[in-house]
C-alpha cells in the first residue's frame, strides 16, 4: 500500500496556497527531547549519526511527538568534512574543534574530494530508511554553507568575531577562493546524493555569515553559493537558504536560484517583503520566546503568522535552533496552535 505524504510544506516552498501554514523547527530533532538526551548518555553525536537506525529514530521523533509538517535529517554540518581530510571532533560544551586548521593555499590544496556513497553511506542509508519505511511528511536534507564551514576550518573551532577567517579572506584571496571552490564542490556532491537518496527538500545553513557585510558577501561568498544552488536546481527539490544575523543579506539571497529564504527574528516578514524579497519565506520566531509563558508565545506567534499569511509561500519556523531547555509540550502545543489558527484564516 502506498503511503500518503503530507505535502503542505513542499507546496508552501513552491509559493502555492496551502490549507494551513506548515511548520517545522530548526533543531527539532534532539536537544530538548528526553529520549534524545538518554541516547546522548550512551553515544556521541557522531556515533548516533553513523548508525542509520538510531539516526532515523531521532529524526522522526519530532514528527511523531509534535505533529510537524516536515522532518529534518539528524546530522551535523561537520559530517562531510572528514571525507575531504579535515580532522574534526565535536567536544561537549565547545562544539566542533579542528585539529588541522587552514593557514595557507597549500593547506587548501591538500583537501580531497567527497564520494558520498563511499564516504558517508550512513547518511544516505538513513535517508532511504526514513523515506521508504517511516515518514509520512517530507524529509529535509541539509548541509553547511562554505563560509560557515570555512570559518571552523580556519579558526580551528567556534569564534566570537571570525577575525582569522576574515583576515584570511582579505589577505589570501587566491587561497580563499580555492577553499570556496573546494567546499562548493563538496556541498554539491553531498547534497545531490541526499536528494537522490530521497530527501524532498534541502536547507543550506550559513550560521555565521552574518559576520560579513553585503559587499564582502557579493565578492567573496556569493559566487560559491550561486554555483551550489545552480547545480542543486537540476535535482528539482525545493532549496532553502538560512543564515543567522544576516538580514542585510536577504536581498542577495533573493537573486540566487533557490525557493525559500529563512529569516531570523531581526527582520520582520512584512519588512522583508517590503524590501523586495519575492521568494517564499520561512521563519522567524525568536527561540527565546519559547521559554516565556504561553500567552506571550501565542501573541508573538499570531503576529508572525498574520504577516506570513499576507502572501502565499510561507512556512513557520524559528529564527534559529531550539534551546535545550524548551519543553517538548510547548512545541506540541505550538504546532497544534499554528495549524488551528491558520486553517481558519
From Swiss-Prot:
Record has Cytoplasm as a keyword: yes
GO process terms (BP): protoporphyrinogen IX biosynthetic process
Any one GO molecular-function label of the UniProt entry: uroporphyrinogen decarboxylase activity
Pathway(s): Porphyrin-containing compound metabolism; protoporphyrin-IX biosynthesis; coproporphyrinogen-III from 5-aminolevulinate: step 4/4
Keyword Lyase: yes
Broad class of enzyme this protein falls into: lyase
Highest taxon in the source lineage: Bacteria
Reactions catalysed according to its record: uroporphyrinogen III + 4 H(+) = coproporphyrinogen III + 4 CO2
Signal sequence region: none
Transmembrane residue ranges: none
Subunit comment: Homodimer.
PANTHER family (alphabetical): METHYLTETRAHYDROFOLATE:HOMOCYSTEINE METHYLTRANSFERASE RELATED (PTHR21091), UROPORPHYRINOGEN DECARBOXYLASE (PTHR21091:SF169)
Reported function: Catalyzes the decarboxylation of four acetate groups of uroporphyrinogen-III to yield coproporphyrinogen-III.
Protein name: Uroporphyrinogen decarboxylase
Gene source species: Geobacillus thermodenitrificans (strain NG80-2)
Amino acid at each position: 500500500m502506498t503511503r500518503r505524504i503530507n505535502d503542505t510544506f513542499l507546496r508552501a516552498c513552491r509559493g502555492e496556497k496551502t490549507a494551513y501554514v506548515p511548520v517545522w523547527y530548526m533543531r527539532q530533532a534532539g536537544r530538548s527531547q528526553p529520549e534524545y538526551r538518554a541516547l546522548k548518555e550512551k553515544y556521541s553525536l557522531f556515533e548516533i549519526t553513523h548508525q542509520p537506525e538510531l539516526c532515523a529514530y531521532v529524526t522522526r521523533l519530532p514528527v511523531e511527538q509534535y505533529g510537524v509538517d516536515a522532518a529534518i535529517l539528524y546530522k551535523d554540518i561537520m559530517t562531510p568534512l572528514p571525507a575531504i581530510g579535515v580532522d574534526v571532533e565535536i567536544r561537549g560544551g565547545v562544539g566542533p574543534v579542528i585539529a588541522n586548521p587552514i593557514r595557507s593555499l597549500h593547506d587548501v590544496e591538500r583537501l580531497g574530494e567527497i564520494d558520498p556513497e563511499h564516504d558517508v553511506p550512513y547518511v544516505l542509508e538513513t535517508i532511504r530508511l526514513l523515506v521508504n519505511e517511516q515518514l509520512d511528511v517530507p524529509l529535509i536534507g541539509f548541509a553547511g554553507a562554505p563560509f560557515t564551514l570555512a570559518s571552523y576550518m580556519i579558526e580551528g573551532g567556534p569564534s566570537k568575531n571570525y577575525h582569522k577567517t576574515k583576515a584570511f579572506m582579505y589577505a589570501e584571496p587566491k587561497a580563499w577562493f580555492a577553499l570556496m571552490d573546494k567546499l562548493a564542490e563538496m556541498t554539491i556532491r553531498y547534497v545531490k546524493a541526499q536528494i537522490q537518496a530521497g530527501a524532498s527538500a534541502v536547507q543550506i545553513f550559513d550560521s555565521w555569515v552574518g559576520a560579513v557585510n553585503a559587499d564582502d558577501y557579493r565578492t567573496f561568498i556569493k559566487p560559491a553559493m550561486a554555483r551550489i544552488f545552480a547545480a542543486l536546481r537540476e535535482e528539482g527539490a525545493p532549496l532553502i537558504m538560512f543564515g543567522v544575523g544576516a538580514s542585510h543579506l536577504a536581498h542577495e539571497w533573493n537573486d540566487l536560484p533557490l525557493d525559500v529564504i529563512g529569516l531570523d527574528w531581526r527582520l520582520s516578514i512584512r519588512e522583508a517583503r517590503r524590501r523586495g524579497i519575492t521568494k517564499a519565506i520561512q521563519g522567524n520566531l525568536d527561540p527565546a520566546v519559547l521559554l516565556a509563558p504561553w500567552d506571550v508565545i501565542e501573541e508573538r506567534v499570531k503576529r508572525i503568522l498574520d504577516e506570513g499569511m499576507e502572501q502565499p509561500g510561507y512556512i513557520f519556523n524559528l529564527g534559529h535552533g531550539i534551546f535545550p531547555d524548551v519543553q517538548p509540550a510547548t512545541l506540541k502545543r505550538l504546532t497544534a496552535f499554528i495549524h488551528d489558527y491558520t486553517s481558519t484564516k
